[in-house]
């Protein structure tokens, strides 16, 4: 079966490794576009929805085609020719979730209207039954995307609420990091079991929590199952997911994870989130200043940070000072094999701080985060 996933653009390399670890065979990676196409068996559906830490949505690919000067009639014909009786039961409702990118003489609303009509007519042809449409809470979500001249039609196995919404969060920081990006940064750091992980500006605790979930082999889908659910259950039932759950072996090991923040309110919220995620006992939350790390710690193996960008929190001038002093302090507690991973939208300002503190940039790349272009830096001494 063919599939495609969506994720934060820029993190395709990390999600590719995750898909392959689940047994998926990569067919195409859309670099910096947040899409990966692959194939595999049905088990991939519950595996990715329940176990993936870096992917936001998984879809079954029903049709993909380049159509020069694509028109609404082209969309109708391709959608009409799909056997919808295979995916939608007679008593189920459906909804089209359209997406359009590029220059066209139609809107995404037009795509939704035409595709919806095609599904209804196609089903009537095959079953002599008119399917129900439910735009708010459909049983089956059909994704119809027109990306320039390409038409992509798929069944959404995740649902309207993407996988980055884990379900454990009870406290929201005003600039909290997307959970799938946080997990991707932890993967990037190659953090070992016996190493210390420090987030010096932890906010609501996303990075420490995602790191702890990873080390304890706690599936991220565990907390969203009852809160948000998974759309594939409506199509395939619980059997596939139950089989995956039986294979999971969690552990209660204690790992060296520290979340630091100078705002006690954020720390209290982070503790609540960690408690909900069943990892509070392995994370030490400390009130402290990211520019004075040497006063709290002798050394750290892995530092991962999502510092303020000066957009939602802090002014540009204060951010520049923070970056300079943070890197200066981080350098004092790093050793030869330490890694420092930072994500920021103020990459020019951060590059100045890197140069000023003589760090080596091992890797850097762009990541789209909430409509904002950010840059990830992997630094060593």
Swiss-Prot record:
Entry annotated with the keyword Transferase: yes
EC nos: 2.1.1.256
Residue sites binding S-adenosyl-L-methionine per the record: 173-177, 204-206, 261, 289-290, 306
Subcellular location: Cytoplasm
Molecular function GO terms recorded: RNA binding; tRNA (guanine(6)-N2)-methyltransferase activity; tRNA (guanine) methyltransferase activity
Keyword vocabulary terms for this entry: Cytoplasm, Methyltransferase, RNA-binding, S-adenosyl-L-methionine, Transferase, tRNA processing
Annotated InterPro entries: DNA_methylase_N6_adenine_CS, RlmKL-like_Mtase, RlmKL-like_Mtase_CS, RlmL_1st, SAM-dependent_MTases_sf, THUMP_dom, tRNA_guanine-N2-MTase
Enzyme class: transferase
Chief location of this protein within or outside the cell: cytoplasm
Any one GO CC term of the record: cytoplasm
Catalytic reactions on record: guanosine(6) in tRNA + S-adenosyl-L-methionine = N(2)-methylguanosine(6) in tRNA + S-adenosyl-L-homocysteine + H(+)
Pfam families, per the entry: RlmL_1st, THUMP, UPF0020
Example of a GO biological process term: tRNA methylation
Gene3D superfamilies, per database record: 3.30.2130.30, Vaccinia Virus protein VP39
Domain of life, source organism: Archaea
Residue ranges occupied by any THUMP domain in the UniProt entry: 43-157
Function: S-adenosyl-L-methionine-dependent methyltransferase that catalyzes the methylation of the guanosine nucleotide at position 6 (m2G6) in tRNA(Cys).
NCBIfam families attached to this UniProt entry: Trm14_Arch
Recorded family membership: Belongs to the methyltransferase superfamily.
Protein name, per record: tRNA (guanine(6)-N2)-methyltransferase
């Amino acid at each position: 079966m063919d599939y495609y996933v969506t994720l934060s653009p820029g993190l395709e390399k990390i999600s590719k490794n995750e898909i392959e670890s689940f047994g998926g065979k990569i067919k195409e990676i859309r670099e910096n576009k947040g899409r990966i196409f692959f194939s595999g068996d049905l088990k991939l559906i519950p595996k990715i929805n329940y176990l993936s830490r870096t992917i936001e949505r998984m879809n079954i690919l029903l049709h993909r085609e380049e159509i020069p000067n694509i028109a609404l009639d082209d969309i109708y014909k391709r959608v009409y020719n799909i056997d919808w009786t295979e995916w939608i039961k007679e008593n189920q409702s459906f909804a089209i979730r359209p997406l359009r990118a590029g220059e066209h003489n139609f809107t995404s609303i037009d795509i939704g209207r035409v595709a919806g009509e095609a599904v209804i007519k196609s089903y009537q042809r095959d079953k002599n039954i008119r399917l129900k449409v439910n735009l708010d809470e459909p049983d089956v979500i059909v994704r119809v995307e027109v990306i320039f001249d390409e038409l992509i039609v798929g069944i959404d196995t995740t649902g309207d609420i993407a996988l980055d919404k884990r379900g454990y969060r009870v406290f929201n920081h005003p600039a909290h990091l997307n959970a799938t990006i946080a997990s991707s940064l932890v993967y990037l750091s190659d953090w070992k079991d016996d190493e210390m992980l420090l987030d010096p500006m932890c906010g609501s605790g996303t990075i420490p929590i995602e790191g702890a979930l990873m080390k304890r082999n706690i599936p991220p889908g565990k907390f969203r199952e009852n809160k948000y659910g998974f759309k594939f259950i409506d199509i395939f039932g619980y059997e596939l997911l139950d089989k995956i759950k039986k294979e999971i072996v969690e552990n209660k090991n204690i790992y060296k994870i520290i979340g630091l923040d100078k705002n006690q309110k954020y720390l209290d919220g982070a503790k609540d989130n960690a408690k909900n995620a069943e990892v509070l006992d392995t994370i030490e939350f400390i009130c402290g200043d990211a520019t004075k790390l040497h006063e709290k710690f002798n050394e750290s193996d892995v530092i991962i940070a999502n510092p303020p960008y000066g957009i939602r929190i802090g002014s540009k001038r204060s951010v520049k000072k923070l970056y300079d002093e943070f890197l200066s302090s981080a350098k004092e507690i790093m050793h030869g094999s330490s890694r420092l991973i930072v994500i920021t939208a103020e990459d020019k300002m951060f590059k100045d701080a890197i140069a000023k503190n003589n760090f080596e940039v091992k890797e850097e790349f762009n990541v789209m985060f909430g409509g904002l272009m950010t840059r990830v830096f992997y630094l060593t001494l």
